[in-house]
UniProtKB/Swiss-Prot annotation:
Gene3D superfamilies: NusB-like (1.10.940.10). GO terms for biological process: DNA-templated transcription termination; transcription antitermination. This is Transcription antitermination protein NusB. The gene is nusB. Pfam families: NusB (PF01029). HAMAP family: NusB.
Length: 145
């Protein structure tokens, strides 16, 4: 299937689980059954979706910190799902370069959200990367590996 398609499924699941908060495991399993996923795709989707919700407080704090003047309740649910996915990838997945996480998030925004969303998401994620790189000891620049 590929990482891009898996990322799209993960974003849709994060969005769906934000809207319908009950029976998460059942919703995840039902959604995954709809697709012909190999083991790598399935593992990636499960890791990202479960990781977003496990780390949601931290991720949402990051979004609020860098979306000056925007409360989470003002951010569209689709944009929020995209941001949560990308920030999880950037902060908790060492196998995904920052530029890939940002570019994929912007593409998802272009396909699933409003006109301004790509710029909004790019701006927030750019600030996240800048802070991560400034606070790193030089070993965390995954884009140069």
């Amino acid at each position: 299937m590929g990482r891009r398609a898996s990322r799209e499924i993960a974003m849709k699941l994060i969005y769906q689980l934000e809207i319908q908060k009950d029976s998460r495991e059942e919703q995840i399993n039902n959604t995954l059954e709809q697709y012909d996923l190999n083991e790598n795709d399935r593992e990636y989707i499960l890791d990202v979706v479960k990781g977003v919700f496990k780390n949601q407080e931290e991720i949402d704090g990051t979004i609020e910190k860098f979306s000056k003047g925007w409360k989470l309740s003002r951010i569209s649910k689709v944009d929020l799902a995209i941001l949560r996915l990308a920030i999880y990838e950037m902060c908790h997945r060492d196998d995904i370069p920052f530029t890939v996480a940002i570019n994929e998030a912007v593409e998802l925004a272009k396909n699933y959200s409003g006109e301004e969303s790509g710029s909004f998401i790019n701006g927030i994620l750019g600030k996240v990367v800048k802070v991560k790189l400034m606070s790193a000891d030089g070993n965390e620049n995954r884009d140069e590996e």
